[in-house]
UniProtKB/Swiss-Prot annotation:
Organism: Lepisma saccharinum
Protein function: Tropomyosin, in association with the troponin complex, plays a central role in the calcium dependent regulation of muscle contraction.
Family annotation (InterPro entries): Tropomyosin (IPR000533)
Sections of the chain in a coiled coil: 1-273
Regions of compositional bias (Basic and acidic residues) in chain numbering: 155-171
Lineage, highest ranks first: Eukaryota, Metazoa, Ecdysozoa, Arthropoda, Hexapoda
A Pfam family annotated for this UniProt entry: Tropomyosin
Location of the region described as Disordered in the Swiss-Prot/TrEMBL record: 155-187
GO MF entry, a single one: protein homodimerization activity
Protein name: Tropomyosin Lep s 1.0101
Key words, A-Z: Allergen, Coiled coil, Muscle protein, Repeat
Protein's GO biological process: regulation of muscle contraction
Length: 284
């Protein structure tokens, strides 16, 4: 009887242990079910994540292609701008060379103008000298004429002195002829100087016109240089802006590439996590 009681107690204890173990197993089963449900939810989320990652990857790839195209366009624009700047530099250099040549021609013209002015002043001075000489010769001729008149009067008053008077008259007539020749020579010289003065005046007018045209060309070259300088600065500003924009695009491309790499790493991590989860589920 005692043995039966012990056996029943042992069986009851075994039953209690079995019930406790069953409760524990049931609790473990519930935990396992909850874990399974959670894992299934995570699996569903993970299934959605690759699609989202793929969408993000596609969008990033499209953005990268667009950025590359914009970068190529900006590089072409930068190349064209650099060509335009080089062309403007060549034009400015050519205009500066033309300006230097024009300034040299202007300097030569001013030198010739100075020489012509000096020649005109010299010719005017000679004209005044010859006019003074001509006036002196005319005064001398008037004086000789008066002497001739006096000699004739003396000849009329004194017949006895006719030989002396004739000699004086001859001398006076010779002096008068010399004076007339000098007057004629002076008049001819004056006419020559007047013609020369006219030529010099025409040369001066021509040089003044040339100087005015040269000044106009210089002003035109200066205006062209000013305009080209403004265009050059604008082209340089556009080139600088294009270069900054290209750098900005390059940074954006680098950022997209980094983001793409991060997304790839994230996708690989998610794939590894999914594989591990499936392996754990298969173990259950």
């Amino acid at each position: 009887m005692e043995a039966i009681k012990k056996k029943m107690q042992a069986m009851k204890l075994e039953k209690d242990n079995a019930m406790d173990k069953a409760d524990a197993l049931e609790a473990q089963a519930r935990d396992a079910n909850r874990k399974a449900d959670k894992i299934l939810e995570e699996v569903q989320d993970l299934k959605k994540k690759p699609s989202q990652v793929e969408t993000d990857f596609t969008t990033t790839k499209e953005n990268l292609a667009t950025a590359n195209k914009n970068l190529e366009d900006k590089e072409k624009t930068l190349t064209n701008t650099e060509s335009e700047v080089a062309s403007l530099n060549r034009k400015v250099q050519m205009i500066e060379e033309n300006l230097e040549r024009s300034e040299e021609r202007l300097g030569t013209a001013l030198t010739k103008l100075g020489e012509a002015s000096h020649a005109a002043d010299e010719a005017s001075r000679m004209c005044k000298v010859l006019e003074n000489r001509s006036q002196q010769d005319e005064e001398r001729m008037d004086q000789l004429t008066n002497q001739l008149k006096e000699a004739r009067m003396l000849a009329e008053d004194a017949d006895g002195k006719s030989d002396e008077v004739s000699r004086k008259m001859a001398q006076v007539e010779d002096d008068l002829e010399v004076a007339e020749d000098r007057v004629k020579s002076g008049d001819s010289k004056i006419m020559e100087l007047e013609e020369e003065l006219k030529v010099v005046g025409n040369s001066l007018k021509s040089l003044e016109v040339s100087e005015e045209k040269a000044n106009q060309r210089v002003e035109e070259y200066k205006r062209q240089i000013k305009t080209l300088t403004v265009k050059l600065k604008e082209a340089e500003a556009r080139a600088e802006y294009a270069e900054k924009y290209v750098k900005k695009l390059q940074k954006e491309v680098d950022r997209l590439e980094d983001e793409l790499g991060i997304n790839k790493d994230r996708y690989r991590a998610l794939a590894d996590e999914m594989d591990q989860t499936f392996a754990e589920l298969s173990g259950y």
